[in-house]
């Protein structure tokens, strides 16, 4: 039980008829979960308005409603200007502000967030004696314990609950992916980030943000909520993003020019990347077992973060040399005895697909075969762009399905094929993704690199609101076993 007054601490209350010293059993923002004595927060969302469910919450026994529009039935209410932001404030109060007990690290950007979180976690655990909580796309982790995740950044109340669990488990640091949606929808409102990291910006989520400028401005919000703002100086959106940053300290990293942390003498090899890192008077050689140029950027932002938290560059490099990569991020799926390589990557955006194919071309001794589709019910404008990238960078393209969701796979594929026009690159269309993978393997030659793009860590395919099992690691292994009998 908490007093209503305690839960509302820090809110600008516009109007109320509620007894502020009344007891509240629990906080709910889903009316279906409300029980007698609860505080129901009517959140205004993009798809639905929580105010519509106030009558249901009242029927279930809600003691008070936190809202933007006062209910007409005279029920106890507290009115605020922004109920979504209020949800974050109440969540912090409900769980006693766990973020204040740990060193918070937030990473935003179109690509690279997931890999960077794992690299930072690895360095801090090996070299700073830290117990690190991780929040991200693949999974959430409390130390070594894995928790299920449904979205990149949880809703604010659930985030506060998770952070409390991490703090109580002894976590000293938390590294989390912070999506543009999370920043715009106040899911991380009030979180005191010690370090904020910006990786890059490329075309994505324009169905939500509408323009690249708005997308950039959403990402920029993190730089007004952190003590140290670390950014990729090579990214063309960095200047705009940092223009209104209020972080007391700024720290840049670069592969191509001058910055606070620089990578030099980059060498990309099959299965790894090597380079020299320099910051101030420190220098070290870095070896990472993730074969891609963008790995250098992910490694730099991880090193920049940990260096700003007191870990020397050489210690960062030593920890990174022991890192074996991240599931579904430039992951090499074993194909012994074939002579070809299968790469699995989550590249489901134009920029990510381009970077993966460029990296594959850098070490492929034969052809680069690109197998990909595009997600249904998502930004349709990127589909022909993905097709163009595949045709321009790959030697052979297999257009297939990703997560069709409620769209017809053939319609999505038709959108992708528009981008292949004007190129002589040979291609084929195989809507069934499993059959497409089999085809790629059956026609591969020694030295080829098959890039399975789009699914990455996912072990399912989403069709008509249902998830069907589909793990590309399993598909490759089983087909290899079948064909080598």
Tell me the role of every PLM-derived stretch.
Residues 1-14, 36-39, 125, 249, ...:
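ATP-dependent carboxylate-amine ligase
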Residues 45-47, 180-181, 202-204, 235-236, ...:
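Short glycine-rich anion-binding loops that position phosphate/pyrophosphate groups of nucleotides
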Residues 63-69, 229-233, 371-372, 395-403:
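Short internal beta-strands
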Residues 6, 10, 67-75, 193-342, ...:
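Acidic, Mg2+-coordinating active-site environments of NTP-dependent enzymes
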Residues 1-89, 259-267, 291, 311-314, ...:
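N-terminal leader/targeting and accessory segments in enzymes
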Residues 74-83, 147-150, 247-251:
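Active-site regions of enzymes building and remodeling cell-envelope glycoconjugates
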Residues 24, 37, 62, 74-75, ...:
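Short, well-ordered alpha-helix to beta-strand connector turns
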Residues 8-11, 87-233, 237-248, 279, ...:
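Phosphate-binding loop of NTP-binding sites
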């Amino acid at each position: 039980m908490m007093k209503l007054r305690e839960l509302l601490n820090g809110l600008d209350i516009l109007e109320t008829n509620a007894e502020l010293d009344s007891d509240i059993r629990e906080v709910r923002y889903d009316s279906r979960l409300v029980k007698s004595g609860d505080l129901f927060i009517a959140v205004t969302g993009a798809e639905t308005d929580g105010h519509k469910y106030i009558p249901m919450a009242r029927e279930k026994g809600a003691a008070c409603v936190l809202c933007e529009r006062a209910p007409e039935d005279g029920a106890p209410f507290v009115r605020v200007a922004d109920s979504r932001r209020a949800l974050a404030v109440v969540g912090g109060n409900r769980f006693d502000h766990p973020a204040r007990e740990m060193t918070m690290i937030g990473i935003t950007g179109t690509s690279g967030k997931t890999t960077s979180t794992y690299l930072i976690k690895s360095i801090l655990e090996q070299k700073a004696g830290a117990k690190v909580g991780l929040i991200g796309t693949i999974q959430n982790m409390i130390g070594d314990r894995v928790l299920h995740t449904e979205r990149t950044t949880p809703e604010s109340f659930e985030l506060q609950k998770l952070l409390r669990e991490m703090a109580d488990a002894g976590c000293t640091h938390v590294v989390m992916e912070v999506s543009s949606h999370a920043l715009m929808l106040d899911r991380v409102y009030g979180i005191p980030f010690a370090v904020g990291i910006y990786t890059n910006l490329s075309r994505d989520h324009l169905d939500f943000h509408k323009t690249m400028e708005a997308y950039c401005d959403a990402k920029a919000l993190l730089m007004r909520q952190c003590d140290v703002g670390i950014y990729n100086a090579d990214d063309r959106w960095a200047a705009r993003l940092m223009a209104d940053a209020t972080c007391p300290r700024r720290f840049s990293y670069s592969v191509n020019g001058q910055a606070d942390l620089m990578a030099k003498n980059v060498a990309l090899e099959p299965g790894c990347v090597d380079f020299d890192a320099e910051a101030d008077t420190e220098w070290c050689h870095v070896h990472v077992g993730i074969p891609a140029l963008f790995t250098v950027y992910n490694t730099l932002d991880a090193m920049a973060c940990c260096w700003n938290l007191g870990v020397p560059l050489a210690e960062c490099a030593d920890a990174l040399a022991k890192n074996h990569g991240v599931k579904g991020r430039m992951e090499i799926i074993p194909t012994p005895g074939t002579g070809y390589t299968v790469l699995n990557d989550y590249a489901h955006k134009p920029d990510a697909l381009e970077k993966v194919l460029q990296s594959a071309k850098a070490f492929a001794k034969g052809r680069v075969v690109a197998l990909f589709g595009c997600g249904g019910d998502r930004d349709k404008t990127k589909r022909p762009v993905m097709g163009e990238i595949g045709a321009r960078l790959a030697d052979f393209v297999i257009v297939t399905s990703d997560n069709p969701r409620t769209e017809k796979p053939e319609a999505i594929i038709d959108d992708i094929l528009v981008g292949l026009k004007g190129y002589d690159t040979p291609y084929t269309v195989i809507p069934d993704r499993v059959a497409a993978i089999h085809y790629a393997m059956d026609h591969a030659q020694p030295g080829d690199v098959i890039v399975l793009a789009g699914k990455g860590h996912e072990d399912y395919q989403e069709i008509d609101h249902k998830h069907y099992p589909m793990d590309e690691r399993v598909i490759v292994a089983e087909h290899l076993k079948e064909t080598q009998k």
